[in-house]
Amino acid sequence: PPPPLFFHADDGIRDRSPSGGLGDVYKRHRLFMDSLCLLSDGVPEVMEFDWEATVKLGLPTGQGFGMSAAGSVSFCNSIQRAIGIPYEEGHRRSLMIAHLVDRKRSSGLGDVTALSAGGVEIRKIPGSPFSGHLLENGPGKSEGWTAEAEIILAWKGEGGKHTSSYIDNPEWRGLISSAGSKNLEELSHKNWNESRWSDIILSSRKFSVESGLSSEKSRSEVLRMCEEAMLEGGMSHSGVALLCMLGTSVAIVPNSLESGLVEVNQVRSLLDDCGLENILTRIGDV
């Protein structure tokens, strides 16, 4: 049997959105227990200890932000560092485990592959970024680049459908896979760098429509609220609202990386007024 695991999961916004219940706690506990059990396959000595872990996430899970993958990676990194495993070896193993957990729980669509690249990422080959006992590269492969640009993330506090409700549904899976493959192919033809920003925005919009995801009432409502806040706040010319997949959430990104977003505080205040949780962040490092 696995060792006792006591944990506290803090999504970083719990004081603003007290919507988490016992079901959320149970799901998170299973996430970390699954991670620990898979970790023990490669590092059996972790089973010799009782563990108490505090996992702090800056965003909610289940909203298309990749927090399940990020939480699993952080958890496995911490456990391995605690028993003296070198960082690079441990981090590779953590990414591999997080990918396996996402597959098992149907909780991600390439989130871990994206995390391994960082920044604005494109997945070239699906699969775990590292594999096998030697933690060699692949089969998954992704590329990323970064830029100095602020982004607003906005979401409904009560959360949306779990990713598994789409991945495990043959009709949804077919629509998402078809739209994703088509738009990914169009993005893969040229070099992956900052010059592709307008292509990314266009493909994101096309994917949300072609997959049918933007037609769901909960998503279209959040998108409408964001676009209205941008118009009223004076941001409609500098930014664009894009759906996050597969949450009930939106990323407000700049039309131009050089110019960035304007009237950020005003728009965030309007998002607060209409009941949307939101946070100001930026494009990540690679």
What are these language model-derived features?
Residues 45-133:
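Gly/Ser-rich oxyanion-binding loop with an adjacent helix/lid
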Residues 125-126, 132-136, 162-168:
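A short secondary-structure junction signal
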Residues 192-286:
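Glycine-rich, charge-dense phosphate/pyrophosphate-binding loop(s)
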Residues 105-107, 113-115, 142-148, 233-236, ...:
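Solvent-exposed alpha-helices and their adjacent loops that cap or buttress functional pockets
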Residues 2, 10-26:
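Short, small-residue-biased leader/transition segments that mark boundaries at the very start
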Residues 140-203, 207-210:
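Acyltransferase
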Residues 19, 23-44:
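Glycine-rich, flexible beta-strand/loop modules in the N-terminal catalytic cores of phosphate-handling
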